[in-house]
């Protein structure tokens, strides 16, 4: 029949018209925006928490703590940062409070610290001093160093210890280990000893001004299997 087009010509026309429906560029219509990177992981997969670390992160989240997981690192022989976090605000019974000058700590240390801060410090502040806790000041955590006067690595070299120097209350008072341990009011002295004793129930090693002169200005809180409190 005159005017009829061969079937091959019609098929080619259909294919070409379908190509015009594809978006411009070299992408197909199935391309999608990559999903967001989960918190605590890297796009390259350089940071993968251990199973224990993942479980601990879930437990730490349950305390209401603000934190960010950090990449693992081996800085020197005996100096490691494994399953560590950068710890921000913590949750008290009725309000949140901040943490000052704290470096990387293991998740287990952070979780223990969060429980102590809420149940041992915030509550003691309200009972003994009549004010809620606003901030805990520290002298740091991770440090690649030995125990003073020895060749043994400190717990600080594994990010498993925190040195606490003072507590700031919502009413503006600052209760410092140095000065108030022996020189504070009766309520302040009682408060500092209560928080020390509470820490002894949670941490493996707790050192206070009663231990030696090197700890006259802070409480050393260290996780572990040991049981030493002074």
Give names to the regions the model predicted.
Residues 41-47, 103-112, 150-151, 177-186:
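Second-shell loop/turn segments in exported
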Residues 20-22:
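A eukaryotic "domain-start" boundary segment
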Residues 127-159:
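Active-site-adjacent substructure of cysteine-protease-like catalytic cores
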Residues 15-18:
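C-terminal motif of bacterial Sec signal peptides marking the signal peptidase cleavage site
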Residues 27-55:
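Post-signal peptide N-terminal segment of mature Sec-exported envelope proteins
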Residues 48-136:
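Active-site acidic/histidine clusters and adjacent loop/turn architecture
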Residues 24-25, 30-32, 82, 86-88, ...:
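Catalytic cores and adjacent binding grooves of peptidoglycan-active enzymes
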Residues 1-9:
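Bacterial N-terminal signal peptides that target proteins for export
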């Amino acid at each position: 029949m005159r005017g009829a087009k061969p079937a091959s010509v019609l098929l080619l026309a259909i294919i070409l018209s379908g190509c015009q429906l594809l978006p411009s560029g070299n992408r197909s219509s199935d391309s999608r925006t990559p999903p967001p990177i989960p918190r605590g992981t890297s796009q390259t997969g350089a940071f993968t928490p251990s199973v224990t670390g993942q479980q601990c992160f879930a437990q730490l989240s349950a305390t209401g703590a603000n934190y960010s997981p950090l990449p693992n690192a081996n800085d020197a022989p005996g100096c490691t940062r494994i399953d560590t976090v950068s710890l921000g605000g913590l949750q008290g019974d009725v309000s949140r409070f901040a943490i000052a000058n704290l470096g990387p700590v293991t998740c287990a240390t952070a979780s223990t610290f969060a429980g102590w801060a809420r149940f041992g410090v915030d509550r003691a502040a309200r009972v003994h001093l009549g004010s809620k806790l606003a901030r805990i000041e520290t002298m740091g955590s991770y440090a690649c160093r030995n125990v003073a006067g020895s060749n043994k690595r400190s717990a600080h070299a594994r990010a498993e210890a925190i040195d606490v120097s003072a507590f700031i209350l919502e009413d503006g008072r600052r209760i410092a280990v140095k000065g108030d341990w022996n020189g504070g009011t009766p309520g302040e002295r009682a408060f500092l000893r209560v928080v020390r004793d509470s820490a002894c129930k949670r941490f493996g090693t707790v050192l206070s001004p009663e231990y030696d002169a090197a700890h006259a200005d802070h409480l050393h809180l260290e996780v572990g299997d040991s049981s030493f409190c002074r």
